[in-house]
Design a protein with these regions (language model features):
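Primary mode marks residue(s) on the alpha4-beta5-alpha5 output face of response regulator receiver
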Residues: 34-212
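Sec/Tat signal peptide C-region and signal peptidase I cleavage site
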Residues: 29-33
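N-terminal secretory signal peptides that target proteins for export/translocation
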Residues: 1-11
Length: 212
């Protein structure tokens, strides 16, 4: 079992809220809207992935009842998740397959009624520390794209904005040389240092404003 540094409740709550906002597509909730056709979901989901990796990525989408379903089995290392039609806004994500146990556990906990963002993170961190939840053994990538909507006809995202997250479980500033807060637009920094959920955030400057 790994030891984990303690964090103030306020700092943990704020940090968890930011992380979950970036990965909103990763946590399905009970359906309130009709799910788009599978072809539409596949086309939108892969928008978060680098272009050379889109065609062979595994794609997860949503059934009419809001549950997650595999829409396409892939042939490379990426898993992409379509926009959740039950949530406001538009967001898709792609991540390395080694992150699937962590992501799937988050979806499972939400289906079990865990809705608090802090508890959702802490439960998974505790399980990872105990060795019951597999985490990546090497740095693993998560791509998160947000936007206004996906236009299937043109295959483009209106006002698309892509963020990069590199999961590096239990990484610390001492291990990486990274700061634990943003230092400027687009500058990398380490979020949740020392925890199973430690990851490097890279947020480019959005059009018309600074990033972090």
């Amino acid at each position: 079992m790994r030891s984990r540094p303690t964090h103030s409740m306020e700092a943990t709550t704020v940090a968890v809220a930011v992380a979950l906002a970036l990965a909103a597509a990763l946590a399905p909730t009970p359906a309130r809207a009709q799910a788009p056709a599978p072809a539409h979901q596949i086309a939108e989901a892969v928008q978060a992935a680098p272009a050379p990796q889109r065609a062979d990525a595994t794609v997860l989408g949503f059934r009419a009842d809001g549950s997650v379903v595999t829409l396409r089995e892939g042939a490379n290392e990426l898993v992409c998740l379509a926009d959740n039609p039950t949530q406001e806004g538009w967001s898709v994500a792609c991540y390395h397959e080694s992150l699937e146990p962590f992501m799937a556990r988050g979806r499972e906990l939400r289906e079990q009624g865990v809705t608090d963002s802090g508890e959702l993170a802490q439960r998974r961190w505790d399980e990872a520390d105990a060795g019951t939840l597999a985490m990546p053994e090497k740095p693993a990538m998560l791509y998160v794209m947000t936007g206004d909507r996906f236009d299937a006809a043109s295959g483009t995202v209106a006002n698309g904005f892509l963020r990069w997250v590199i999961y590096s479980p239990w990484a610390t500033p001492e291990d990486t040389g990274l700061p634990t807060a943003p230092t400027g637009p687009g500058a990398p920094w380490l979020m949740f240092p020392g925890t199973a959920g430690a990851h490097i955030m890279i947020t480019p400057p959005p059009p018309g404003g600074p990033g972090n």
